[in-house]
Amino acid sequence: MSRKTHGETSTSTGGVGTRLLKGIREIVLILLLALVISAVIRAFVGQLFVIPSGSMEQTIEPGDRVAAIKPADFKRGDIVVFKDSGHWLGANPPKRSAAGQFGEFVGVLPNTSSNYLIKRVIGMPGDTVSCCGPKGRMSVNGKPLDENSYLYRTNGVPVEPSQMRFEVRVPRDRIFVMGDHRDASGDSRCHLSDPAPGAYRGASAFIPIDDVVGPAKFTVSPLSRMTHFSTPETFDGIADRSASAPDKADITLHLSLIHISEPTRQEA
């Protein structure tokens, strides 16, 4: 009798162990599949980014998580995320742990890398962008822009489109970008006279189209700020001049006082 009981116990224990191992294998396979799917989505569909600064206020607030869609076309007026190949940013912020960086890599966690920035596209290749006209407006290819719908407001009054006076012609395969909080955005304007090793002065002000991750289409969190970004109507009807875009930007700077308060570590 005791032998039979012992045999039954051994068989029962072996069955539990087999089921446990099978369950572990299934969980591992499910996790691996989820990571692969997430990585594919990140590589070919879209990516989340955490915004730490106020350079795009009040359209995008610090702490918002936005989704950049790729591959997707973008146009003037769209908000885009792009790589900081021009080294606009200063010292890098502290890195996440190895687990956190892996989570970013596979798309489980939003990207917090300092190697990305987010701005609004003002000029496309061949465009002439200038500030400011008789009414203090930015203009693109001679058309004044009504930016009141997205510029940062103080006590209900939009900030000045730009304290810096300039006129540029955007070179081939590059774009000119600005933040919505013009007084707190270290954008293309602020790099028009920067030295650029191996290139002409001011070249780093113009973002290579190849560096654009994609247009930011949604704020996905916090839930109270979930929204969809659309292209402002003021950019409608501007002539396409990409066919005549120069290889080198034309840059004219006018004497003016400019104070940009955006911190060195500005974007994600």
Question: What are the language-model segments listed below?
Answer:
Residues 53-56:
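N-terminal signal-anchor transmembrane helix
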Residues 26-44:
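Hydrophobic membrane-insertion alpha-helices, especially the h-region
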Residues 2-22, 44, 50, 61-257, ...:
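Soluble "head" domains of membrane/secretory-pathway proteins
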